[in-house]
């Protein structure tokens, strides 16, 4: 079969067309990053070749000096980026360039807002890679051959970045990938050797293989002196292997942008070298913003694993727990075998030790930030707070340290901003208070306006206002903090302990006896809708509220589980009556059993709505309400 018969024209995946169009406009103000992305691809290809060559040295094809080379032609207006890494076969080209085989693609596209600055950050997080070439080029030609394939298995891919591309089989003598950009009008700056040198130095100086540029005619004398046609323009040293004192802040920031495909500087980082029984180096970064796919369960992790400076694998989930899945960086170990697999990683003492040490470093970094850079920590919490809350249940060994990092909204500020630490709460506890009080709800306004808070507000007792979906699991995993138990204000009988005097307790007992008959009448009318009816002193303004037993599932958690499609037992609530409320006083004197029944059901349904619950029969609720309104009007 001839080479020509292998040529075909294929259409881009719909998402690719959308991404190309959005990217060209959103990233144009930061267009030089295309070179960083294409160089990064070349570096990844070299890493993959090194790894595969560990078990098959023949893949080097007698050329183990890996590099990336830049060249340009001012007459043809082309810029070429070439590497001698692993290369690609025909099917790999189709899969890697014609489609986006990435979960969350649709969610990503939907999250784009039209705001160029915001969209640029999101596109960077998504990883534009090869597609960034179309920011400055109106035609891109890629020629590649996979290491180990014969010269006749070369592939040429070509596209103008519109709806389709052509792909054909070609002869290619050398392995690796060559990307040639036919630059758009007005992009002549990328045909300037000094401009290219500047971009490489700024974005890719840390890439640990040589990036070379073809000497210009003006450099002819230098070329004749040393006999070299190519000039290396980067340091080509793995940044994490250098002493911390030798690395500039700008170099750390540039390296972060490389590993995270981000446009912004990292929020913080920690660089550590461990020596002794176990030897490894870690360079870990906290991003400034949460990625769009933070809540995708199958999203990739952000840690690259190296063994003795040889890249082994991306997305090493064993190196960082899920609640720290936003961390980016590298880990380089001297104690793992070069041929380690993902299966071996799952039960490996070295990996377990590296993971434990890395987690300690990240938590320590965050603790230091919270203590000394409160504003920066608040920025971190706004982006990653909900994920950090998962750690309380996932990481029992570090639970206390994570608990110190938690931030909540509370009645102290009465704003939705989560700024209150548990230590802050303890420092403001009333004399005689022995519990940390909280309420969970499906929104901040619902938590803030809950009738369960009325007596706490009256007595000036602070209550944490929890409205994140993860909060129910958080409090279930955190029974106490520094000796003080956490207590839901919607569970069990209210016992304020030493915060109430004996006279108050005696008055409450007398009121309960006085309302015993009313309590029994309400229970008889409501039947199985409630587990119990009782008088309460937790209310000051509302007539009723619903609570559950101390160890029962809250109504909010029950709703969360059902929304997630999980089975949840129905918990019978307890209806509590406020004896000081005029409606309850009127109900006490109601002689008509029909009206009494309507009032009892209406109050129960009102309490259910107040805590975010749903009515089983909304039409019946409206009918009762209208009936009672008419009776009152008469």
Swiss-Prot record:
Cellular component, GO annotation: cytoplasm
Superkingdom per UniProt: Bacteria
Q: What compartments host this protein?
A: Cytoplasm
| SMART domains xref list | HATPase_c
Q: Name one Pfam family in it.
A: HATPase_c_3
What are the record keywords, sorted? ATP-binding, Chaperone, Cytoplasm, Nucleotide-binding, Stress response
Region of interest (A), ranges = 1-342
According to the UniProt entry, its GO molecular function terms are: ATP binding; ATP hydrolysis activity; ATP-dependent protein folding chaperone; unfolded protein binding
Q: What is its main location?
A: cytoplasm
Note down the stretches annotated as region B.
Answer: 343-559
InterPro entries, alphabetically? HATPase_C_sf, Heat_shock_protein_90_CS, HSP90_C, Hsp90_fam, Hsp90_N, Ribosomal_Su5_D2-typ_SF
User: Which residues lie within the region annotated C?
Assistant: 560-634
Q: What PANTHER family does the annotation carry? A: HEAT SHOCK PROTEIN 90 FAMILY MEMBER
Q: Which family does it belong to?
A: Belongs to the heat shock protein 90 family.
Q: Please describe the quaternary structure of this protein.
A: Homodimer.
Q: Report the NCBIfam families cross-referenced here.
A: PRK05218.1
Name assigned to this protein: Chaperone protein HtpG
Taxonomic source organism: Nitrosococcus oceani (strain ATCC 19707 / BCRC 17464 / JCM 30415 / NCIMB 11848 / C-107)
Question: Which gene carries the instructions for this protein?
Answer: htpG
